[in-house]
Structures are given as C-alpha cells and as structure tokens.
C-alpha cells in the first residue's frame, strides 16, 4: 500500500507516515472527541526542529509548530527517525532495488536499528541528544557503522545534535557487537 501511495518516494504522504494520526482519529471517533488530549497530527513527514520544551507552547494549533506536550514533542524524534528510514529506502533504490523491495529491506533494517537502540538506550534521565548519540553508537558498534553518517546528518538537520557535533563525542555502546554466522556456530559447539 505504501509503495502504491508513494511510488517509492517516502516524502509523499502515506499510510506508514500517518499511522499516529490515523490512530488518534480512530480513538477520538470511537471513544469521544478529544479523548487523546487533542487532535494530534503526528505524521512522520515533518520539518520540526529542536527547541527547549520549556520555551514552547503546550500544544499549538498549527501542526507545523512543535509543542511541549509529550505527544506533540515526540513528533520531532519520529520525524528524525523517519528521515533515516527514508534515507535507507533511497540508498536501497540507488542500489537497484525496486520500490517494494527497498521498502521491505528498509523496514527490516529499521526494526533492527530500533532494537539495537533500545538495548543501548540511556537509562533514567536523558535528553534527545543523549538518545541520538546512543543511536549512533548502536549502529557503529552493532552494525559496522553502516548508517552512522545518515543518522548523524538527520539528527543534525533536526537540531537534536548541534551543527558542530563530532563523532568523537559518541562513547561505546553497551550493546555487544553482533556475532557473525561463523562466530555464532563456534559458540554453539
């Protein structure tokens, strides 16, 4: 369905990008108006940039404006991750995959990336910048850095990482490097 809607160009509105919006509409339609706390438009296709939540309105009416309310503010991270996901799809297309295969492979890669990030995520009190650094570390240490440049640039573009951010600021990931098939076979013996 996403390929049908976009022809492989994930910057166009599509089911996957608008999943949060559709869920909010469904909940509000079923459970009553404003049940979710607002008419959240949580499309992943956005151009939101980092701002200190203390300086933001709670939940602005303009969907292109970032708000401090947690669901509203989360659109910043969602958009940044979607930028990475779109970049992977584009890389796959450039490598010769058709739109459906590129999307399928990027979806699988995205799930693996999120899994590594969750395992290596900072605990307790952390910032979006801390999470972005953990995302970079998890890819560098668990995926041979395949998407480090893409992740770094996406999070810089969103202001989550500063423009002068250096990879030397990223510490080791607590997630162990993935085993190769040969290493896994040796460990089984």
What is each stretch, according to the model?
Residues 1-189:
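Zinc-dependent metallohydrolase catalytic domains
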């Amino acid at each position: 369905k996403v390929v049908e809607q976009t022809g492989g160009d994930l910057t166009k509105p599509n089911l996957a990008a608008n999943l949060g919006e559709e869920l909010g509409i469904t909940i509000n339609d079923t459970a009553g108006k404003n049940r979710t706390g607002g008419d959240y438009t949580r499309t992943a296709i956005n151009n939101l940039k980092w701002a200190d939540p203390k300086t933001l309105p709670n939940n602005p009416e303009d969907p292109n404006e970032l708000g401090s309310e947690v669901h509203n503010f989360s659109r910043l991270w969602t958009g940044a991750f979607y930028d990475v996901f779109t970049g992977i799809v584009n890389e796959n297309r450039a490598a010769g995959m058709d739109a459906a295969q590129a999307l399928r492979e990027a979806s699988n890669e995205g799930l693996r990336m999120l899994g590594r990030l969750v395992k290596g995520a900072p605990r307790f009190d952390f910032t979006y910048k801390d999470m972005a650094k953990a995302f970079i570390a998890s890819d560098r240490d668990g995926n041979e850095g395949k998407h480090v440049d893409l992740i770094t640039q996406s999070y810089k573009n969103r202001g989550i990482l500063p423009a002068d951010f250096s990879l030397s600021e990223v510490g080791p990931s607590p997630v162990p490097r993935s085993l190769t098939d040969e290493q896994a076979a040796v460990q089984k013996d």
